[in-house]
Amino acid sequence: MHPQLHKCRQLMDAYIRQKRASPGMVQASDLQMSRPMSGMRGNSRELHAYDGPMQFIGSPHNPDQILSNNSSSVHLSSSMNSSRNNSNNLRSLSTINQEDLIEEISSHELEDEESSPVTVVENPLPPLSANSAHSQRLRNGQQSFNETLDEDDYANRNIAGVAPVRPAGIASPYKDGVAPEASNGVANGSNSGVGSAESEGDVIGSIDLFVMQPAPQGVLYKCRITRDRKGMDRGLFPIYYLHLERDYGKKIFLLGGRKRKKSKTSNYIVSCDPTDLSRNADGFCGKLRSNVFGTSFTVFDSGNKDSTESPRLDLAVIIYDTNILGFKGPRNMTVILPGMTEDDQRVKISSADPKQQGILDLWKMKNMDNIVELHNKTPVWNDETQSYVLNFHGRVTQASVKNFQLVHDSDPEYIVMQFGRTSEDVFTMDYRYPLCAMQAFAIALSSFDGKIACE
């Protein structure tokens, strides 16, 4: 070989070895990737980068190759300088864009959360319409169960001509136990047994003391009894609640009663605490107990029958006439109460005290000095409706065998108590002197109880 040619080949080999040893050799693939591709592809190609040496060698066995996951992409330009800059800034741009996107989404979510209540608060209230009372009630909030009545309770309250009653003898209520001079059982005016001449009573003092105090003379207490039959066993053992009706649909809780399950005879517990209807409760006021046939009921206070200092007192006795022949008609009931003293207090009578007789024993012996006897007012037969009717003065709206009015034989126009149905589980109960709330409620409970020999 020519010496000069051999020398040139050695120089070329040395030059090639020097170029292979140079680190700038890796950048050559960028130029190769940036060349125009075939007609089936575009002028640019999607490349993927990662945090490491910038090796873009297209070998399928390259350990540095990162498969595409469509998470981030860059387009290469035709110049080598722009390719280098895009490759070096690829990760930082992707990270910044993701952080900005997350921050922007978070800021929008926070704006939505903060702006919604502001929008609601800033919206003015709509003007009052014709139903302004309803709108005002909505703004003030719903009242609790112990303060208001359901709309269904008052649905038939003022409906005239619907009640199964017929005006019979109507007389003005009187005070001090003296009946007006009138006659023939027919009133000369618009006042009735529950007329407007009396004032409606309100709760005075604590509930536990109020329910035991006799009603003042000349005061009428309008109450409502609600029967709760919801629950597992309340179909057989419902709970009864007594409320005093007030103006504007309000009411005040007075008493609650329930029938004891484990008892040989009907036995009702009465309490002024609606959450605890038991004998051991602090609000225990008394009980109602019947005989085996359900024809006689005795009302007791909360005293202990075995105590000598404060023995249990008899508050009332309710007797239902037996109906063994099964004649259809209204119930006949007799109510015996303790007599009243000159200062309008009950005479203390205790069947638990061996030194004296109870109310029932006094009545059986016709010893009427310290007891008062009441009877249900006799209904009038109406040929048009083919039913027995009484004038409840708009307080009773549905016919029921439980409806009754209690009067004294000396003045049948002075209605001491009346009770009747207004809906399936709602009843009205009005009482006057000499009854107290406990006595009236117990009399009403006796009307609910089943009676074997009376129906």
Swiss-Prot record:
Q: SUPFAM superfamilies, from UniProt?
A: Tubby C-terminal domain-like
Q: Which gene encodes it?
A: king-tubby
Kindly state which keywords UniProt assigns to this record, in alphabetical order.
Cell membrane, Cell projection, Cytoplasm, Membrane, Nucleus, Phosphoprotein
Q: Bias category Low complexity: which stretches?
A: 67-92
- Lipid metabolism is among the record's keywords: no
Region span, Disordered: 35-92
The UniProt entry lists the main location of this chain as cytoplasm
* Record's keyword annotation contains Membrane: yes
Q: Name one GO cellular component term.
A: rhabdomere
What name goes with this protein? Protein king tubby
